[in-house]
Amino acid sequence: MPDEGKVTIFVTSGPETPQRCATPFYMANIAAAMDNEAEMIFQIDGVLLMKKGVADDLFAKEGGKSIMDFIRDAKEADVEMKVCSAALQLHDMTEDDLIEECDGVVGAA
């Protein structure tokens, strides 16, 4: 039986499709506001959103909030954000490349 009150959102879009990057954070924040335990798992190109320096200058909409602002909002809402170990390898990244808002690495790769 699935965990009641827990929501997991998988993020696969990255900087190459910025218009898709804000929505997962909205969904996670809504889930957290509804008293659910919310977590986000960043896979494939989504892992790049957790790379230092990437989200600061990335915008889903011109003149809107940066993706880093969405990441900070999620942190304030106690959303847990983790990256897939295979996605780290795919992008030649290590844990040292990750922003401090990232809660760790999951997976067996």
Kindly give the residue locations of the regions a language model identified:
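Basic/polar N-terminal segments that are highly enriched at the extreme N-terminus
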Residues: M1-E4
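Short, glycine-rich nucleotide/cofactor-binding loops
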Residues: T8-A22, V54-A55
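Short, conserved beta-strand edge motifs with alternating hydrophobic and charged residues
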Residues: T8-V11, E39-Q43, M50
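Histidine-anchored nucleotide/phosphate-binding helix
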Residues: C21-M40
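Short internal beta-strands
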Residues: E37-Q43, M81-S85
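N-terminal beta-loop-helix "entrance" segment that forms/cooperates
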Residues: G46-A60
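A glycine-rich helix N-cap at a beta->alpha junction
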Residues: D57-S85, L90
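C-terminal binding/interaction regions
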Residues: T94, E100-A109
